[in-house]
Amino acid sequence: MSTKRKTAWFAACAAILCVGVPARAHHSFAAEYDKDKPLKFSGTVTKFDLTNPHSWIYIDVMQPDGTVVNWAFETASPSNLFRRGFRKDTIKPGTVVVIEGFGAKDGTHTGNGQRLTMPDGTKYILGTEENPG
């Protein structure tokens, strides 16, 4: 194979990788969540994962029948949360919070977290509040 052909082949492969990987690596709000399923729960934090690409807050929510359901809320990336005043120790297991967001399309106990209210009334924006979709 000639040098020109090798160069063209390499460039084509690199272009496919550069275009294909980012498109597949990230999802959209509309693919997983339903903007017509708003959620607002008061619950107890059981876990907080400050991870990339998105952080997660898990809360136990008491149901009307007395059972407890653990909900998982996807939030912004750590860097976005930090810019909004959030810190690693902002919430800890046992903290009672109010969380608002949108439910998963598949009906699981998963949501896209938009706003968090702490016991002292402090509010944090967790997602893209103005345009969730």
Residue ranges of each PLM-predicted region?
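Sec/Tat signal peptide C-region and signal peptidase I cleavage site
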Residues: V21-A25
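Short aromatic-glycine-enriched beta-strand elements
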Residues: T51-V61
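Short, structured beta-strand/loop micro-motifs enriched in basic residues and often containing a Trp
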Residues: T75-R83
